[in-house]
Curated annotation (Swiss-Prot):
<keyword id="KW-0488">Methylation</keyword>
<feature type="compositionally biased region" description="Basic and acidic residues">
    <location>
        <begin position="150"/>
        <end position="166"/>
    </location>
</feature>
<keyword id="KW-0804">Transcription</keyword>
<comment type="function">
    <text>May negatively affect PAX8-induced thyroglobulin/TG transcription.</text>
</comment>
<dbReference type="GO" id="GO:0005737">
    <property type="term" value="C:cytoplasm"/>
</dbReference>
<dbReference type="InterPro" id="IPR036869">
    <property type="entry name" value="J_dom_sf"/>
</dbReference>
<protein>
    <recommendedName>
        <fullName>DnaJ homolog subfamily C member 17</fullName>
    </recommendedName>
</protein>
<dbReference type="GO" id="GO:0000390">
    <property type="term" value="P:spliceosomal complex disassembly"/>
</dbReference>
<dbReference type="InterPro" id="IPR034254">
    <property type="entry name" value="DNAJC17_RRM"/>
</dbReference>
<dbReference type="Pfam" id="PF00226">
    <property type="entry name" value="DnaJ"/>
</dbReference>
<feature type="domain" description="RRM">
    <location>
        <begin position="178"/>
        <end position="249"/>
    </location>
</feature>
<feature type="region of interest" description="Disordered">
    <location>
        <begin position="78"/>
        <end position="124"/>
    </location>
</feature>
<dbReference type="GO" id="GO:0000122">
    <property type="term" value="P:negative regulation of transcription by RNA polymerase II"/>
</dbReference>
<keyword id="KW-0694">RNA-binding</keyword>
<dbReference type="InterPro" id="IPR012677">
    <property type="entry name" value="Nucleotide-bd_a/b_plait_sf"/>
</dbReference>
<dbReference type="InterPro" id="IPR052094">
    <property type="entry name" value="Pre-mRNA-splicing_ERAD"/>
</dbReference>
<feature type="domain" description="J">
    <location>
        <begin position="11"/>
        <end position="76"/>
    </location>
</feature>
Amino acid sequence: MAVTKELLQMDLYALLGIEEKAADKEVKKAYRQKALSCHPDKNPDNPRAAELFHQLSQALEVLTDAAARAAYDKVRKARKQAAERTQRLDEKRKKVKLDLEARERQAQAQGTEEEEESRSTTTLEQEIARLREEGSRQLEEQQRLIQEQIRQDREQRLRGRTENTEGKGTPKLKLKWKCKKEDESQGGYSRDILLRLLQKYGEVLNLVLSKKKAGNAIVEFATVRAAELAVRNEVGLADNPLKVSWLEGQPQGTVDPSPPGLSKGSVLSERDYESLVMMRMRQAAERQQLIAQMQQEDEGRPT
C-alpha cells in the first residue's frame, strides 16, 4: 500500500469515529461498521464510495499495527501541537515566533520541530511499506467478513419476504418477566439487554416495552424462523427468567413450547452474532406507526 500525502494529513481516528486510545477490537469494530455502510457493492451510485472504502482500509492497517500506529500518533501529535500553538498566536506574536524559530534553526545543528516531524513521517512510511510487504491479513479478513455480512443480509431479506407471503404480516412475540412497578431496573431487563438477547435469532424490527404494565414487552421479528427460534430457545436472565409466547404470526401446526432449558447448543452464541449479525440494519424509521399501534393495543389489553 503506497502511502499518500492525503493519508498523512488525515485524522484516522476521526475517520473511523473512535477515540485515540481505542483498543484493536474497537478499531476493527468501527472499521466494519463504517466500511459496510460505504462498501461499493452497497453504494453503486456513490462515486466516492470506493475512495472512502480504500481510506478506511488504510486506516485499519495503520491503527491495528503497533509500530505503524505509534509512528502515526507521533506525526499526529506534532501536527496537533503545532496547530494549537499557531491558533493561540495573533499576527504580531506569530511574526515574533517565526523570527525566533529562524534564529534557532541557524544556531542549532539538529532537533527542530520540522525535522522531528519529517523523521516521524519517514518512520510511518517505512512501517506502511513493511505492512505492504508482509501482506495485510487483518484487512483481508475484515473485508471477507463484510462480504459475508452483505450476503447474509441479502439472504435474510429474501427469507423474510418468502416467509411472510401468506398475508399474516411480520411475527410478533409477547415477553413477560417478574418486575415490580417501582423497580427502576425493570427486573434486570432494559431495552438494550432485551435486544442483545433477541437479535442473535434474527433481525428485530421493533421492540416496545410497556409503560403501563411493568415486566411486559412486544417484539417484532423480520422472519418467522427468527421468532420460532426465540420462542423455542430464549430463557432470559438466570435470576429472572423470561417468558416468550406468540402474539401474532404463529405458523399453523405449532404450539408454544414449555420454558426451554440451557442445553449446550440451544442458543446461538454471542460470538456467532458478533461476527455474522453485528451489522444487521433495522428499519425502525419506517415502522413508527406500527410501534404506536402496538403500544395502544398493549395499553388497552387487560392485565
